[in-house]
Amino acid sequence: MKDLFRISGVTHFELPLLPNNIPFACHPEFQSISLKIDKWFLGKMRIADETSKKKVLESRIGLYACMMHPHAKREKLVLAGKHLWAVFLLDDLLESSSKHEMPQLNLTISNLANGNSDEDYTNPLLALYREVMEEIRAAMEPPLLDRYVQCVGASLEAVKDQVHRRAEKSIPGVEEYKLARRATGFMEAVGGIMTEFCIGIRLSQAQIQSPIFRELLNSVSDHVILVNDLLSFRKEFYGGDYHHNWISVLLHHSPRGTSFQDVVDRLCEMIQAEELSILALRKKIADEEGSDSELTKFAREFPMVASGSLVWSYVTGRYHGYGNPLLTGEIFSGTWLLHPMATVVLPSKFRMDTMRFSLAPKKRDSFP
């Protein structure tokens, strides 16, 4: 485990400016919609103290939904944002559970997803997911809902395997990690299914089963995970949970003499390669299907999950520390000084041209 000792001694690294050529947008009503989503969460979780409120608001989950589905109808976007909050918390709950708790927890979540549970849950996270799923089942058409339930079930099984491996603190192989993270990320449900739901896309069975549809799902999921593992590394580093991160995996399987910076640079190259893959698939689908195809509509909208995730990963206090003045809505690059409390980057920041809104709420907005 010498690689982990090398990681534990890292104090800083150079963060390049990540590419973001995938079309990016944010819902024009993002301020009021994200506020509504986050206020709903504060109310449901009965969060009253100012410090905890600040953490919720600076996590910017409501804003994340507005970036993932910028062209959604308002009411569907609000529901997608509620679902995003629920899945984030369920993911945290799953990853903090022991391997002995996992089978029952998986069964409970599966039952909540498919509506087979009448139990009253004392765990507020499970109660929250139950309420969200009641809304989703009422709003989502049955074929899409069936696919959603299948996606959640597959992700739960994959998370169970991941928890077992994390308990052993073992580092998987490169391809093994890639496939495992695809499976555990809930991205097909949170990104793919929710894109279809929010935009009103109706894919045929043939389109769903086509290889190029699966390629696009995988490529967007891989891009989201690569960015996540890079920009959340500080949080995982100080949480002691960096065995399952692209940086650890690449370092462990790289030739002798490979530096931490070499691995960061390689990870950034992988992000760029995945971006190019997404753009190529987007064009290929449009060329083959035509502009009116439902699959073309999906290929136009779904990649925004990747670009939205990239931007959100730069502005969330969940990764970079709450109350951090660095999080202004700009993409940053430069020397990243690892610090237990917050992301510190010196000296350069580069404004992102595609982001043309302030993260500050309007004066008329108020929080509970």
Curated annotation (Swiss-Prot):
Gene Ontology biological-process entries: terpenoid biosynthetic process
Induction statement: Up-regulated by alamethicin treatment.
Annotated Pfam families: Terpene_syn_C_2
Enzyme Commission number, as recorded: 4.2.3.48, 4.2.3.25
This protein's record includes keyword ATP-binding: no
Motif DDXXE motif mapped to chain: 91-95
Reactions this protein catalyses: (2E,6E)-farnesyl diphosphate + H2O = (3S,6E)-nerolidol + diphosphate; (2E)-geranyl diphosphate + H2O = (S)-linalool + diphosphate
Binding site for Mg(2+) 1: D91
One MF term in the entry's GO annotations: metal ion binding
Cofactor(s) required, per the database record: Mg(2+); Mn(2+)
UniProt KW keywords: Lyase, Magnesium, Metal-binding
Functional pathway: Secondary metabolite biosynthesis; terpenoid biosynthesis
Protein residues bound to Mg(2+) 3: N228, S232
Binding site for Mg(2+) 2: D91
Stored InterPro entries: Isoprenoid_synthase_dom_sf, Terpene_cyclase-like_2
UniProt-listed SUPFAM superfamilies: Terpenoid synthases
Extent of the signal sequence: none
Domain of life: Eukaryota
Entry note about domains: The Asp-Asp-Xaa-Xaa-Asp/Glu (DDXXD/E) motif is important for the catalytic activity, presumably through binding to Mg(2+).
PANTHER family the UniProt entry points to: BETA-PINACENE SYNTHASE-RELATED, TERPENE SYNTHASE
Any further remark recorded for this protein: Selaginella moellendorffii contains two distinct types of functional terpene synthases (TPS) genes, the typical seed plants TPS genes (SmTPSs) and a microbial type TPS genes (SmMTPSLs).
Described function: Sesquiterpene synthase converting farnesyl diphosphate to nerolidol. Also has a monoterpene synthase activity, converting geranyl diphosphate into linalool as the major product. Has no diterpene synthase activity.
UniProt family annotation: Belongs to the terpene synthase family.
Protein name: (3S,6E)-nerolidol synthase
Gene source species: Selaginella moellendorffii (Spikemoss)
Lineage of the species this protein comes from: Eukaryota, Viridiplantae, Streptophyta, Embryophyta, Tracheophyta
